[in-house]
Amino acid sequence: MFSPGQEEPSAPNKEPVKYRELVVLGYNGALPNGDRGRRKSRFALYKRTYASGVKPSTIHMVSTPQASKAISSRGHHSISYTLSRSQTVVVEYTHDKDTDMFQVGRSTESPIDFVVTDTVSGGQNEDAQITQSTISRFACRIVCDRNEPYTARIFAAGFDSSKNIFLGEKAAKWKNPDGHMDGLTTNGVLVMHPQGGFTEESQPGVWREISVCGDVYTLRETRSAQQRGKLVESETNVLQDGSLIDLCGATLLWRTADGLFHAPTQKHIEALRQEINAARPQCPVGLNTLAFPSINRKEVVEEKQPWAYLSCGHVHGYHSWGHRSDTEANERECPMCRTVGPYVPLWLGCEAGFYVDAGPPTHAFTPCGHVCSEKSAKYWSQIPLPHGTHAFHAACPFCATQLVGEQNCIKLIFQGPVD
């Protein structure tokens, strides 16, 4: 449907318009095996050379599968709602010159602009794949206005290679009071808009489900329940800076150009790393100098790497003594304050899109040890992210590890002039 070349059009003497960016939670700047093509941890949506949007047009009531197939194979985009073996509603879509459409899903077929797979928590290698993915092959579509302010709306389900969306007999679907059909996908597309935007003062919003036609509903009892939630008429499917999109297996963060303009850059995070290292923090026991490893070497524990006791926040170098538990190999007693708890290496959070401010990296998530600014750590510590088909819990945005402890994060205590 779209060639890869259309992703980033290059008009002569003119910078392409970037609508927004999507960042996949659980990756610290790149996929474990590297970003490749339409599979990456961060995806920019650019204005297309030619409008790619579609809008609803003709509605057909058909009584045979053959008639339904005939309409669906005309070359137009269409959504088929199978009500029974003898009744299907087919909604044809026509070209919309005022919008661009981008599709997200697990499929690697050409209609998908941004390929996402199940996020493995803890930053494990992608080879430790889930045996059966819960992400839909054609999960959702995002439609952006081609004119300012480039409003973006999200819809459940994406068009396949035949330009069709099929909602079978068992799918949740219904006819609205105004007569138009709508439905939900099997595991649903959930969206959460933070209160107050994506800033230092933001608070978590309420998770909602988005329908195929873009209406907003309260959550079903479980992800795949037949009964839809209640329509929330006061809310819309318009995405805003900091909106979270959950596809049941991967969660995406929506960032606007203005939001990213005020966010730290990769260079800023690297400068903060160098600033901490220049202060020469020391292990209070071994008195050896500690240093955060280069951003390019964020998978390998290095000799000078800082480690921390996550129950108290004291930062040390690595040592093998202090075990206080036969069952928990990671439980150690801090030599500074005698507090017992997890003892882990510290990793700098490198994905700038997850920061709500440009503050210094002073706090670590527990139990993974990813470090970022205080306000960013506290923001993510209070966000309930969908887990599985009916659970929610806070998780580290850099590795998707479920957070634990009283605050889900801890203030780090460095020995020396850093603190």
Curated annotation (Swiss-Prot):
* Record carries keyword Iron-sulfur: no
- Residue span, FHA domain: 15-202
- GO MF term (any one): protein-macromolecule adaptor activity
Q: Which InterPro entries match?
A: Pellino_fam (IPR006800), Pellino_FHA (IPR048334), Pellino_RING (IPR048335)
Q: Name one GO cellular component term.
A: cytosol
Its EC number is: 2.3.2.27
- Source organism's superkingdom? Eukaryota
Q: What pathway does this protein act in?
A: Protein modification; protein ubiquitination
Q: Which catalysed reactions does the entry list for this protein?
A: S-ubiquitinyl-[E2 ubiquitin-conjugating enzyme]-L-cysteine + [acceptor protein]-L-lysine = [E2 ubiquitin-conjugating enzyme]-L-cysteine + N(6)-ubiquitinyl-[acceptor protein]-L-lysine
GO biological process: one example: regulation of Toll signaling pathway
Family indicated by similarity = Belongs to the pellino family.
Query: What's this protein's function?
Result: E3 ubiquitin ligase catalyzing the covalent attachment of ubiquitin moieties onto substrate proteins. Involved in the TLR and IL-1 signaling pathways via interaction with the complex containing IRAK kinases and TRAF6. Mediates IL1B-induced IRAK1 'Lys-63'-linked polyubiquitination and possibly 'Lys-48'-linked ubiquitination. May be important for LPS- and IL1B-induced MAP3K7-dependent, but not MAP3K3-dependent, NF-kappa-B activation. Can activate the MAP (mitogen activated protein) kinase pathway leading to activation of ELK1.
UniProt cross-references to PANTHER family, sorted A to Z: E3 UBIQUITIN-PROTEIN LIGASE PELLINO HOMOLOG 2, E3 UBIQUITIN-PROTEIN LIGASE PELLINO-RELATED
This protein's assembly is summarised as: Interacts with TRAF6, IRAK4 and MAP3K7. Interacts with IRAK1. Interacts with BCL10; this interaction is impaired by SOCS3.
Protein name in the entry: E3 ubiquitin-protein ligase pellino homolog 2
Q: What's the source species for this entry?
A: Mus musculus (Mouse)
